[in-house]
């Protein structure tokens, strides 16, 4: 158990937050607090020069109630001015400009968009001119890709050789469609990336212990993954339900796309197990804000 002291809304009202890591003996993400904002980073990515990345937490924003306090969604009923201030605070803490963010339009597809200079600010300073985009890739310095979460799986990709990046949102539908592999293939096509040189990461999301699904979902995983992987991905229960491991599924997808095992970072941090620290759709029964994954090129 990891304890941090947090000023939830930067009002001098400090509280102790317990972070439950999934496997205490495994490598963890770094917990960073700057300017009152707490966010997460990967040690492996921190060693790659020329890139910026982060995964937000609930701590350090100005939103209230069920959105407390670092909500990054404009569409869940929070005040727009609070959400904009949250973006500003997070960007300042991590070290990029809010105006450089490009956001996804997540609808559980496997669509991956090539992001260019013209996209700068989409979803933040101007409306998005696209829909149905769950993944993005770019090689434009200064742009920061952003995708959003409250249990689904963030997938990060960095190609330090060609200075290119990818960031994708993978719920169970995106995992069945292997959006992680689609993202890598698009990076190969657009930038000449070699998968063996790409560093990948699976982000904080719902763990297998918390993720119960029905037979119809498992049928799609059986169709998408070879039988020798099934035992690692899910197990059945007497009531006919299953516990599904989206972390392992996306890890296998990254390996299948050609990434090296030693280049893949895992989160060991479950959104549903940490409802005070991270937003979780399941833990909150849908009454929540959104977390954000961010990845950019300096």
Sequence positions of predicted segments:
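Active-site microenvironment for binding and transforming phosphate-containing groups
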Residues: 2-298
